[in-house]
């Protein structure tokens, strides 16, 4: 039997999966997130987390690193060649062997596209858009936060939600039902100082995640109710998402019809975002005159690692 390991390293968690040569997932473990951009120790700290997970998976299955034919790591935050190279240096120091490192955005294509060709658009903790074209060329768009104009991820939505409420309460600019939803869900009054108290929650590690999640939840509740300010944000998200997707069509070779687009990340797969996703598809096709097949990833992204390794005969 041949063994392979797939690593899906995200901002909040990292999954390590052991596969055989028939694509069967034999076992899996999880650790904390391994995105170096979120860690005080940067890439060395991320390498420590990754190796701890790999070693835990090996130990659990009575295997050694030399028993593994190949390991494919798909890691959030690996956006530049220099980051890739530094990560490899750190992993080599820690005894890693026979492995490849890519940005995590690429494995969703290998996991969700029936032929391994397509565009993957991820909106989760962050945003990135990756593709593998008909020639096997790989391209990444976005992933650099405000520098690249990323929209649609959880932190961005939470920020936009707070801003709309701020505009209503503090600027008296536009009424939004988000204000009433915030009053209800956070137990605050629709007053300036009460709203600003949420900033302390966003800066508190113990409360930050739940506060962001609540802001996201009330945002989609307002969208479902047709709240005009919230719908304005949805239109921004869809327009920017369409621009990201079409950047791949313009810069790569997709001489197929329709073009596969795999949507991944919690905003696309775990939240009631149908209104947004429908508008995203509509704008993508309207701006390009092309047909696209949009699918939401319904399997663990880490399965894209084994598909990729066997497709490319890594370790063969």
Task: Enumerate the predicted regions with their spans.
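ATP-binding/phosphotransfer module of carbohydrate and carboxylate kinases, centering on a glycine-rich
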Residues: 1-67, 90, 112-117, 163-316
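Glycine-rich beta-strand-to-loop/alpha-helix junction loops that act as flexible
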Residues: 72-78, 123-126, 259-270
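Structural motif
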Residues: 74, 102, 295-297
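Flexible, active-site-adjacent loop/turn segments at secondary-structure boundaries
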Residues: 76, 145-146, 197, 265
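Phosphate-binding/catalytic loop of phosphoryl-transfer enzymes
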Residues: 78-175
């Amino acid at each position: 039997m041949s063994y392979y390991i797939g690593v899906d390293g995200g901002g909040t968690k990292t999954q390590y999966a052991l596969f055989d040569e028939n694509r069967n997932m034999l076992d899996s473990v999880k650790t904390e997130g391994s995105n170096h951009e979120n860690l005080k120790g940067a890439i060395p700290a991320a390498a420590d987390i990754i190796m701890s997970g790999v070693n835990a998976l090996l130990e659990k299955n009575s295997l050694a690193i030399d028993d593994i034919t190949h390991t494919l790591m798909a890691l959030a935050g690996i956006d530049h060649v220099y980051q890739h190279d530094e990560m490899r240096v750190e992993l080599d120091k820690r005894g890693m062997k026979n492995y490849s490192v890519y940005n995590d955005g690429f494995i969703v294509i290998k996991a969700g596209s029936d032929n391994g060709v397509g565009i993957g658009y991820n909106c989760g903790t962050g945003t990135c858009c990756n593709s593998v074209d008909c020639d096997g060329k790989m391209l990444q768009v976005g992933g650099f936060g405000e520098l690249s104009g990323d929209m649609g991820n959880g932190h961005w939505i939470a920020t936009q939600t707070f801003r709309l409420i701020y505009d209503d309460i503090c600027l008296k600019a536009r009424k939004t039902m988000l204000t009433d939803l915030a009053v209800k869900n956070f137990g605050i009054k629709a007053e300036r100082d009460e709203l600003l108290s949420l900033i302390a929650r966003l800066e508190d590690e113990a409360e930050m995640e739940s506060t962001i999640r609540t802001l996201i939840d009330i945002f989609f509740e307002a969208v479902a109710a047709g709240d005009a300010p919230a719908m304005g944000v949805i239109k921004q998200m869809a327009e920017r998402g369409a621009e990201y997707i079409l950047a791949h069509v313009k810069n790569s070779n997709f001489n197929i019809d329709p073009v596969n687009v795999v949507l991944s990340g919690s905003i696309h797969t775990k939240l009631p975002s149908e209104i947004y996703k429908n508008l995203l598809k509509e704008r993508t096709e309207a701006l390009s005159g092309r047909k696209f097949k949009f699918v939401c990833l319904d399997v663990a992204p880490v399965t894209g690692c084994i598909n990729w390794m066997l497709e490319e005969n890594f370790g063969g």
